């Protein structure tokens, strides 16, 4: 088998963005899962930051993971992958200068693309999440990311949460990110095709959706026609693995341990209640989410 180089995988991802068909990204998290994804016909994968947080820390997705810890996980995937892999680079692990370091490290790890989001992370004292950073600061991160890549085929994807602000602000933000040279725009929180059209009619840059399996946005032909090239439907493979591990350990132990649902398993073994209490105590922020204390939506989705 002739293996494709990281540069070739990046070129393949660029071709996908410039194509005419929407592709669904496989949620991958280790060498085995990315090889499975390739064999099952996926043309692109994504290493979710929330999944890496679970793997490394057993913690909710609240920006506790360090850059080095994330890069270690991505490197393991990058070594084995023969499909392009997108890295979830969160907020770039800091300001625009931190973004430059993040791009350099993830490029060496072998990713084909990375997303940079405009969410303010980690959450600040007494700050109700999610809060977006300023448009100019976010655009500066895109400029810095493009400047710091040594392989121009590495795609920089600007990510924004449209549910965290107004339609008008989202339009202004995505226009600024396109002007800054983002290779694609990633949207979180899109409601339906009407909402998608309103958000993207001013853009020529390819679109990526974090969709969570939204039934109102599942028509591949319509997605393709709307210039959507990548859809991420959450990280079901890893969560299914958690459920299977618990069941297998129950059987091996011969224990009469309780039958726990997936949300119950996640809550118990990521210590969600403890993090919620610590957040209230030390950040003076209350959280009502039943899935966790993540500032970016349901823990079970991303």
From Swiss-Prot:
Binding positions for substrate per the UniProt entry: 50, 159, 235
Binding site for Mg(2+): 88
One annotated GO molecular function: magnesium ion binding
Cofactor(s) in the UniProt record: Mg(2+)
Catalytic activity reported: oxaloacetate + H(+) = pyruvate + CO2
BP terms from Gene Ontology: oxaloacetate metabolic process; propionate catabolic process, 2-methylcitrate cycle; pyruvate biosynthetic process
Similarity-based family: Belongs to the isocitrate lyase/PEP mutase superfamily. Oxaloacetate decarboxylase family.
Protein name per Swiss-Prot or TrEMBL: Oxaloacetate decarboxylase 2
Organism of provenance: Pseudomonas putida (strain W619)
